[in-house]
Amino acid sequence: MLHLAILMFCVFSITTGEFVVAGILPEVASDLGVSVGSAGLLVTAYAAGMIVGGPVLTALTTGIDRKRLMQALLAVAIAGNAVSALAPGFSPLLAARVVTALVTSTFFAQAIVLTVRSAPPERAATMVARLAFGMNLAMILGAPIGTQIGGQWGWRATFAAIAGACLLGLGLVSWRLTSPGRDGRSSAVSELRVLGRAPVLMALAITAVGNVGVLMVFSYLAPLLTELGGHPSARLPILLLTYGLGATFGNLIGGVLYDRNPRLFQPALLGLLAAALVAGWSVATSSALTVVAVAVLGFFGFAILPGMQARVMATAAEAPTLAMAVNASGYQVAAACAGLFGGLIADSSAGPRPLYLVAAALTACGLVLTVLATRASRAPDSEEAVATAN
């Protein structure tokens, strides 16, 4: 369990750097003499770095010992955040953020594979959920603390603190993490071939389609809660914390449920998420009920993730690391599409309320794909057969 705690802390440290930027954008913009909109490119560039760079870097580092690779990735994260803290202008800061983004999904993919392979196959989703708890903590603790540090000592202190946390993570990995060697990994070309299989492509599609709806609502929670729900802007941090707490419990419980019966619970969780989105639409103008809706959406929005990640790993058993990196990119693509198309809906004459129904419909599409994939997995080339063969 110690190695899991170490990896969880490393994930917490790295992903805090991803989530915290939104909270310090005004300070960055003011200090570097750019508009808040221009400073927002830090978020866009980071996402682009994860989408493109994560899979490429993972493919290029296929043959490297996992422990040494994770040490190198943490070193890059330390350097990227340190350069961010010392950046003399916006362009160097933007470049440093892109470099840091390159290692985020690669490290998470390595950590997931290492964690899952240290546990019995029937506990794969549970282990993924426990590791992802570090990401949940980054959302509900790391980002607020980093924002507070930025408000107290300046945004540069925020990046310096993240660099320090990554440095501590590097020390812990070097001290206690056991190197598994190459653990039977194949070449990059062989792993790319694995990603072309129909079950793998279906699993990746489920991640993208199944998440875009809830991400659309999350991206526009502020107008949904203030314009429709009647909440004052000052209450938004508390409501976001409510979402984060729901997400934390959903992530942990979703992993346990998937391991107990993936054929039953993964479709059920997606169906309940779609129903929760419809319920969110129906109570959108009630201040009290929207608080409950936010917590429920956070719960089911994250309860579906461990099972999705476990399915990707099972269908791509010969290339789990690259598959997880591509899966993370798929999630980021879903987030980008959610922001883009959600904005079009929110700016329409109907206002933001239809976001709930559009999100429910998209989630239902993810449910359909999951049911189809579950039925197909009963064939001899199913994900279970692949997992058993390995």
Predicted regions and their residues:
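Helix-breaking motifs and short loop linkers at transmembrane-helix boundaries and internal kinks
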Residues: G33, D65, L86-P92, V283-T285
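Conserved MFS/SLC helix-loop-helix module at the cytosolic interface between two early adjacent transmembrane helices
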Residues: V52-P88
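Helix-to-loop junctions at the C-terminal end of transmembrane segments
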Residues: G54-R66, G250-P262, A346-D347
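C-terminal transmembrane helical hairpin of 12-TM major facilitator-type secondary transporters
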Residues: L264-M308
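A late C-terminal transmembrane helix in Major Facilitator Superfamily
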Residues: T315-A350, A359
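Cytoplasmic helix-loop-helix junction between adjacent transmembrane helices
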Residues: A96-M135
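Helix-loop-helix hairpin linking two adjacent transmembrane segments in secondary transporters
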Residues: F90-P92, P120-T178, L224
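Paired small-residue
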Residues: G80, S91-T100, A288-V296
